[in-house]
Amino acid sequence: MIENRDVVIITEFDGTKIVVINDIVFKGKQNIDWDNVKEYLKGYIGDFYEISESAEKIYIGSKLSDEYTNSEARKALRGANAKAKANAASAIPELIQIASNPKWEENRKIKHNDMAKYGWYRYDVKFAIPVYDNEILIRYNIYGARLLVNHSHNGKKYLYDILEIKKETSKPHHFAW
């Protein structure tokens, strides 16, 4: 378990939950050190977290850190979306907790036959990253994403990656709580 994280869950007026990441662990947009992100994620291995709306347990296995940092989807990310994915690593427990709208799909790749014997699930999540100007917080950018979870041969579900990270184009949020 990784400690000393400054992450909270808030609920919007419509009931949508957003994970607010208050502490930027991985700074910069251009040159994120993905090896540091990989090492950070290893701190979760062996943990499990529960999805609030379904009480399903999602485990963190040893494959997460490599897939999260080296997947083709990650390599395609640039700028703010890459920074958002890197910093979402600090909010894995809360992102799992707010996961909603599960979509199941059959495993289609032979190489995943064991680890995704019972298929894949994609869950919707939202998170917020602070934007600073000269070290003064000016707003939060909101991102939507999908948690990719494999349903393994042992019956457990494991977080495999976070995909489809997209900045919301609505007006930026100024949270007050």
Language-model features: where?
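Ribonuclease/tRNase effector modules and their secretory precursors
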Residues: M1-W177
